[in-house]
Amino acid sequence: MAGWCWARRRKPQRLRATYTRRCGIEQLHGFYDVHADCLVGRIRKRKKARDIVACFTQLRACYPIQLRIYVVMDNLSANQRAAKDFFPGHNMEAVYLPTDASWLNAIECEFTALHAATLKNSDDRAHQIRRSRIYRYLRRRNRTHGSTRCSLARFMR
């Protein structure tokens, strides 16, 4: 069971050490609509430019083309190049955060809650288990916040 909660004191069941990732790691591309309070994400094997552009394409399809989308981004070089090439023709604009200032991004608070509910104290043997837990959390979070009907909710379908 992942996440954390209060429990009686007893001898805890220890988690195995995961210093080496034999199955590799996965990347969560997250999008947060601040107006509708809607959080969505897509998990990919890599964070390369083509994966980022695929997520941007899916994001653009959620909103009408007349609506300008401002995307707050960190300073990852793959993000900058992909955005520079993709955004001008799709009525989107990148807003880059200052270096070491990710706390300015509103999505970081949402990622903290996601981490506490799904990843903290977890010991998953397969990526599919972790993926399904993250997607289940995102669906439940949007349902409890009443943001299942926002345009960005189509991203998860």
Q: Residue ranges of each PLM-predicted region?
A:
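Extended, low-complexity cationic-aromatic segments
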Residues: 1-54, 157
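RNase H-like two-metal-ion nuclease catalytic core shared by retroviral integrases
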Residues: 73-75, 95-117, 128
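Short, aromatic/basic amphipathic alpha-helical patches
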Residues: 81-89
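C-terminal anion-handling pockets and recognition modules
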Residues: 108-157
